[in-house]
Amino acid sequence: METVRFTVPGAPKGKARARTVRSKKGGTFSYTPEGTMLYENLIKCCYRQESNNIIFNDGQPLKVTIIAYYPIVKSTSKKKKQQMLEDLMFPTKKPDIDNIAKSILDALNKLAYRDDTQVVTLHMEKHYAEDPRVEVEIEAVSYTHLTLPTTERV
């Protein structure tokens, strides 16, 4: 099965909600905040550079793994920093894990795949690192490779 891996440099960023404002004529319109648009453009650039322009087939089930590495604040003690790097402490701060996933998956719409509805398995983790980044892996999966829960479905 086909797999694409790429890295987005810098601290992870979550997808901000759309802003709705009133126009001078009394109507309303929504727009995506500039920070979100810039981050999604960075994701697209990183994908293009590292993917050899692979586009997964329409309807192809996909497994996506996202590992977000958060920066360690400079004022952190040596002991605490070591614990963070050894995964004895995890980032329990913003951005939320689901908003990071949303920014990655939405940015790849119509670029890596037709729509993120093709993602049938999503695995995500948050860690600390001296080199903040987001690592993404997209893998085409066959229906026979999908694992089902061990409990019975009703």
Annotate the PLM regions.
Residues 1-122, 137-142:
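Histidine-centered catalytic/metal-coordination loop motif
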Residues 121-132:
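Beta-rich nucleic-acid/ligand-interaction surfaces
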Residues 144-150:
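Conserved small/polar residues in nucleotide/adenosyl-binding loops
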